[in-house]
Amino acid sequence: MARLESVQNAADHARCVADRIAGKPHPYTALPWFWSEQGEQRLQIAGLTNGFDRTVTRGAVESGEFSVFCYRGGQLAGIESVNRPADHAHARRLLSGGRQVTPEQAADESFDLRAAATARPA
């Protein structure tokens, strides 16, 4: 079990518990996500990025604007972004919608993450 401490996670859990108390139980399925600003840097994480067996970097680390896509068992498990808010937003849509991108697609700057994130699941 992972311990997640963020405002969003607390709010999502509160809604789930309130629904249970009101007699409308449902499983907790919210996608964990987090952000923090550290000086000039914005760090954003979507999904659970622990236990990965492969990572793919999109963007240039040297530029200070990049995302690391984390894969577990060939499936996208999460993304860690630094100063790439669009990657974070698209990854949240991908992960919460059960959509996948291959490591090759994630690494390819010409691949349209937005289109993949908004496409209907197969």
Name the predicted role of every residue range:
Residues 1-85:
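Mid-to-C-terminal Rossmann-like scaffold of FAD/NAD(P)H-dependent oxidoreductases
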Residues 21, 50, 95-98, 110-113:
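Alpha-helix boundary/capping residues
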Residues 30-31, 91, 108:
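Flexible domain-boundary/linker segments
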Residues 37-45, 97, 114-119:
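Short amphipathic alpha-helical patches
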Residues 62, 94-97, 120-121:
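Short, charged/polar low-complexity linear motifs in solvent-exposed/disordered segments
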Residues 82, 90-93, 112-117:
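A general structural signal for short secondary-structure boundary/capping elements
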Residues 85-104:
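A short, polar/charged loop-to-alpha-helix boundary motif
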Residues 100-122:
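Cysteine/selenocysteine-centered motifs that mediate thiol-based redox chemistry or coordinate metal-sulfur cofactors
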